Regions:
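Juxta-kinase regulatory segment immediately upstream of eukaryotic protein kinase catalytic domains
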Residues: 2-60, 64, 79-119, 127-128
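Protein kinase glycine-rich loop
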Residues: 127-134, 138
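Conserved HxN/HPN-centered segment at the entrance to the catalytic loop
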Residues: 184, 210-219
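Conserved short submotifs of the Hanks-type protein kinase catalytic core
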Residues: 224-238
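Activation segment signature within eukaryotic-like protein kinase domains
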Residues: 254-255
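Catalytic-loop of the protein kinase fold
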Residues: 266-283
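Regulatory extensions flanking the kinase catalytic core
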Residues: 301, 453-454, 465-507
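C-terminal lobe substrate-recognition/regulatory segment of protein kinase catalytic domains
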Residues: 332, 336-343, 409-463
């Protein structure tokens, strides 16, 4: 599916992952989210954004186990065909119900999209809207011209699924199921989005096209002022439906998939800026996930100014000693200086409330990939506490208060000084020392002393504390996280699950 975006050939943007597969299934809608975009872009942003959906499942390819008994292999092959036929029939029923469920307003929008792009109806058949946000709307569509283009982005191997090895073909013909439809997610980007924002997202997706667990860009089209991006249609579950029932090994697998994606992104010096459950599409059945929505992503250092957090300790002490706050500390006066000659600080504050790192709230002007690690830590805290959302602040001040309630005012003051900010509060609910993550988890899950944490749970909390370190310089990296003992649990459990499934499939 070749296309052209402002003269940029986007036909070769998809990865050639021959060691992975994915299946395309029904989408599950998730919740609305509110985006906090940077001050420089407030004219573009709206108050609420519903996460745009694309669905996914990755299945790692392992060594194929040969069947030495031809009759057993024939029986196994027939079982595969029967199961696939059942899935196909269920998919046709689901698709039929989807078509009936589209309301008139959505149908009008879909008809307009198809009419705005010449030849659109010959390539795609829109089925329904699966996401709507501040900057775009996402639709599920059938790829009518799938067989006419290079689909190396599609990890599914139909020939291996339907046809057994030549030496073991069944003697009697077996009816081949109807080839199931191929779906894509079509992201229509609003004309209110700046061209630079659109181009930035597509360029980043192009750079990440070979990365595991990252949603690839198939192609993109522009007609006059209308821009659409074509993405794979990935399967995932609703985070709210499964996160409370996850076991520690399952949590480890989930986080391992997420940090695999983060490592790929961070290796390219890219900040995602919007890590949250609805932007990491995870399928609990296959235990595979994919990172999506790079609308707020940017390259590290693209808009940086020096910040104290990256200076030496001696330089920070010198700057703090000569600050306005230090000069007034002997005789502090309430309020703000009447004639403040200091220039206002402007920094990127993009992200979703409840998932933004402390340095984003403190307006750090030199933000790095560590902001994504904090957000991943919030996801882990959400899962272990069984509370979603865990942080539910309405603005930056409330967000800092929520964090200070856990970490204590002393550590929050130190975190603020790292970025040249002063954190002061007189709220009685915020203590000096804060609370340990272990206590937070026990209180949130209503567990008493009769139900102490298991060794695996303590390992998970240790990993959580490494992710939610207030000092971004001391926060764990994605590469280090993948070597952590907690995420190694997920690798062992995933391998065990695979070999158990292989053994079951032989019989």
């Amino acid at each position: 599916m070749s296309g052209n975006f402002w003269g940029i050939d986007m036909a070769a943007t998809a990865p050639h992952h021959h060691d992975r597969q994915f299946e395309i299934h029904e989408d599950i809608r998730t919740e609305d989210t509110e985006m906090m975009v940077e001050e420089e872009r407030t004219e573009e942003a709206g108050p609420n954004e519903e996460d745009e959906h694309v669905q996914h499942s990755h299945v790692h390819q392992h060594h194929h186990i040969q069947h030495h008994n031809p009759q057993q292999q024939q029986h196994h092959h027939v079982q595969q065909q029967t199961h696939a036929a059942q899935e196909e029939e269920e998919e046709r029923v689901e698709e039929s119900s989807e078509d009936e469920a589209v309301d008139r307003g959505v149908q009008e929008d879909m008809d307009k999209l198809q009419s705005d792009f010449p030849g659109f109806r010959n390539r795609y058949r829109l089925i329904k809207r699966i996401g709507e946000g501040t900057f775009s709307t996402v639709y599920k569509a059938e790829d009518i011209m799938y067989d006419h283009y290079d689909n190396s982005w599609d990890y599914e191997d139909d020939s291996s699924k339907w046809t057994p090895p030549p030496s073991a073909k069944p003697s009697s013909p077996v009816q081949r199921p109807r080839r199931k439809a191929r779906y894509v997610a079509i992201k229509k980007i609003y004309v209110t989005s700046s061209p630079s924002r659109i181009l930035n997202e597509l360029e980043l997706l192009h750079d990440l096209r070979q990365c595991p667990s990252v949603c690839p860009l198939i192609t993109a089209f522009r007609h006059t002022d209308q821009v659409v991006a074509i993405l794979p249609y990935f399967r995932h579950g609703d985070f709210r439906a499964y996160f409370r029932d996850m076991t520690i090994p399952e949590i480890s697998i989930y986080l391992r998939e997420l940090f695999t994606a983060l490592k790929s992104v961070h290796d390219h010096k890219i900040l995602h800026r919007d890590i949250k459950p609805t932007n990491f599409l995870y399928d609990p059945t296959t235990q595979r996930g994919v990172l999506v929505d790079f609308g707020l992503a940017e390259r590290e250092g693209s808009d940086n100014k020096p910040c104290l957090c990256n200076e030496s300790r001696e330089v920070r002490k010198h700057r703090q000693a000569n600050s306005v706050w230090a000069q007034n500390s002997t005789n502090p006066q309430p309020g703000y200086p009447k004639s403040d000659t200091r220039s206002s600080r402007r920094a990127n504050r993009a992200g979703t409330r409840g998932f933004r790192a402390p340095e984003v709230l403190f307006k750090c002007t030199e933000q790095k990939t560590s902001i994504d690690i904090w957000s991943a830590g919030v996801i882990l805290l959400t899962i272990m506490s069984k509370r979603f959302p865990f942080f539910n602040s309405a603005d930056d001040v409330d967000a800092m208060i929520e964090i200070a309630t856990i970490f204590g005012s002393k550590r929050m003051k130190a975190a603020g000084l790292l970025h040249g900010c002063v954190f002061e509060t007189s709220l009685p609910t915020i203590g000096q020392g804060g609370f340990s993550m272990e206590k937070i988890i026990l209180w949130s899950t209503c567990r008493g002393e009769d139900k102490p944490l298991t060794p695996d749970e303590k390992m998970a909390i240790s990993f959580l504390e490494s992710c939610m370190e207030l000092d971004p310089g001391r926060r764990i990296t994605a590469e280090e996280a993948l070597r952590h003992d907690f995420l190694q649990l997920g690798e062992v459990e995933s391998d065990k699950r695979y070999y158990d499934q292989e053994s079951a499939d032989q019989y």
